[in-house]
């Protein structure tokens, strides 16, 4: 039973390994994708049309929506709001560049904003939208050239919203107007697609809105985050579908409500249909290492002389939970806390409350650590009392080992008898700590996923809580604090176990060298509080005699 601390140590190492592996999955290098399946000879090259009389059937015309190359040198409309700088291509009427003005690329480049949507060869991430018709002309991002009254729009100080209309009209009397609506202090962009039918025949079809994306090149460790599609449907409210999945099998679902998004670390772009009825969600590999993920709202029929419209919302911005939740139900799940969301969300709420109180995310983490320590105070007290009693028994345990030598059975029996006599539970110090592990894991994911901590300073040399400590001071302090904790705990009687336990601070220091400073800060503060509590309880036990 004296091996309990070695078991606990092994459990903690396993937890760290699993966290490291999970980090590599979502924040490590992106793996090479399998080659996409080749089309068979019978599949043909042309795009099939939308089934005219079967609106509930899968709309197969989306299969080749992205075969046209992205046009370069096209005429551009530039839009600037208080939060966004946007470029819209007139050749398709779609957004091909979105810059987030309040989010610099790095602390070293404070005047260079993050570019979420872009077309930087070979990396591509753009929106595409249009109309696919079963009866009448299709107006797609591949086939039309829009016009606009101006080429530059800016949301001025006394305006709360800004409209950017783009129009296209054919010789037969079909007129399409795409209107983008921007709001002050918002990353949501509303898109209204209006169809005016000036012909003598009904127009029937669907709108589509999608993302076209190439997987970013693989970077070094911690250089890349998970990049991929996410769908929310009635069947599954949050479903990741990465590029590897789409390379091997296309995605299609029908659902009322829902949304489709492309996510990456800290930022998200999402299409949200606003029409009533059943939406069709899809994703697939197309060509030139490009992937699409999108949605088609329900089909509409527009009689001659009438007009109709499709409405969608586009969110392009940081993963700020309350803003995401206001755009669409469950969109806040793109802030992915993993399987322990039920614990991570209240922890984030409490940390945010502390930030509003003190105005610094680093001090908010410190205060959050105090609260977590207070919640587990009684459990920790039980653990440290058990350790203190074990420490008092240490000389007698060593005497038993000397008396019985290599007879492990007799040593074990004698130790158990001593534990019963002194009313000491050798596992009493283990269970309370194990119970706290889920909370630590929830804190881990909460600190990693919170865009609010991105480039947030603490004090002195810590200028970004989401980056590693540039001078490794916090990891070293953590190692020292763990070493001090060990000195307050009973040493293992087995020499091999003693050597393994002695390596524990070194191993944890190495593990945490590359972890974000905010997470290491939590661990350091937690260790310091644990040392104070353990020292106080140990002194009490020793004074009791």
From Swiss-Prot:
One example of the protein's molecular function in GO is: membrane insertase activity
Q: Which Gene3D superfamilies match?
A: 2.70.98.90
Q: Which Pfam families does the UniProt record give?
A: 60KD_IMP (PF02096), YidC_periplas (PF14849)
Recorded topology in the membrane: Multi-pass membrane protein
UniProt keyword annotation of Nucleotidyltransferase present: no
**Any keyword Kinase?**
no
Q: Which family does it belong to?
A: Belongs to the OXA1/ALB3/YidC family. Type 1 subfamily.
Summarize subunit and interaction data from the UniProt record for this chain.
Interacts with the Sec translocase complex via SecD. Specifically interacts with transmembrane segments of nascent integral membrane proteins during membrane integration.
Q: What is this protein called?
A: Membrane protein insertase YidC
């Amino acid at each position: 039973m004296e091996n309990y601390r070695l078991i606990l140590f092994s459990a903690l190492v396993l937890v760290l390994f699993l966290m490291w592996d999970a980090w590599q999955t979502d924040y490590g290098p992106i793996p090479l994708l399998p080659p996409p399946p080749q089309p068979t000879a019978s599949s043909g090259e042309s795009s099939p049309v939308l089934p005219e009389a079967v609106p509930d059937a899968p709309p197969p015309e989306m299969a080749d929506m992205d075969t046209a190359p992205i046009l370069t040198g096209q005429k551009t409309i530039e839009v600037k709001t208080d939060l966004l700088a946007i470029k819209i291509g007139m050749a398709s009427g779609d957004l091909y560049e979105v810059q987030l003005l309040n989010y610099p690329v790095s602390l070293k480049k404070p005047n260079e904003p993050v570019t979420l949507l872009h077309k930087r060869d070979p990396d591509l991430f753009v929106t595409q939208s249009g109309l696919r018709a079963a009866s009448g002309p299709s107006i797609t991002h591949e086939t039309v050239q829009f016009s606009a009254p101006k080429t530059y729009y800016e949301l001025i100080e006394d305006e709360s919203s800004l409209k950017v209309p783009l129009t296209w009209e054919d010789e037969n009397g079909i007129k399409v107007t795409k209107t983008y609506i921007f709001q002050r202090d918002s990353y949501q962009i509303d898109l209204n697609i209006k169809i005016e039918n000036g012909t003598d025949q009904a127009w029937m079809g669907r709108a589509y809105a999608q993302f076209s994306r190439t997987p970013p090149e693989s970077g070094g460790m911690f250089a890349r985050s998970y990049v991929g599609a996410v769908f929310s449907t009635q069947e599954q409210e949050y479903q990741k579908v990465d590029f590897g999945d789409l390379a091997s099998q296309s995605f299609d679902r029908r659902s009322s409500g829902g949304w489709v998004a492309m996510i990456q670390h800290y930022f998200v772009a999402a299409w949200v249909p606003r029409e009533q009825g059943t939406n069709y969600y899809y994703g697939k590999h197309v060509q030139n290492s490009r992937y699409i993920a999108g949605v088609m709202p329900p089909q509409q029929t527009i009689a001659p002389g009438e007009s109709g419209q499709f409405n969608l919302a586009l969110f392009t911005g940081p993963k700020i939970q309350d803003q995401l939740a206001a755009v669409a139900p469950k969109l806040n799940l793109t802030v992915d806390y993993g399987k322990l969301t039920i614990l991570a969300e209240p922890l984030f709420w409490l940390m945010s409350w502390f930030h509003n109180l003190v105005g610094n995310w680093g001090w908010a983490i410190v205060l959050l650590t105090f609260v977590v320590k207070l919640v587990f105070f009684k459990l920790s007290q039980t653990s440290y009392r058990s350790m203190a009693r074990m420490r008092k028994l240490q000389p007698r345990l060593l005497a038993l080992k000397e008396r019985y030598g290599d007879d492990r059975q007799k040593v074990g029996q004698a130790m158990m008898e001593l534990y019963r006599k002194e009313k000491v539970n050798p596992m009493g110090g283990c269970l309370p700590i194990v119970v706290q592990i889920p909370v630590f894991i929830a804190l881990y994911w909460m600190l990693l996923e919170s865009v609010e901590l991105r480039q947030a300073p603490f004090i002195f040399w810590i200028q970004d809580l989401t980056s590693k400590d540039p001078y490794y001071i916090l990891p070293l302090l953590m190692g020292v604090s763990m070493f001090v904790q060990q000195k307050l705990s009973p040493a293992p009687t087995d020499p091999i176990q003693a050597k393994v336990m002695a390596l524990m601070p070194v191993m944890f220091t190495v593990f945490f060298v590359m972890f974000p400073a905010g997470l290491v800060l939590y661990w350091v503060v937690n260790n310091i509080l644990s040392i104070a509590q353990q020292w106080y309880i140990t002194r009490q036990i020793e004074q009791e005699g």
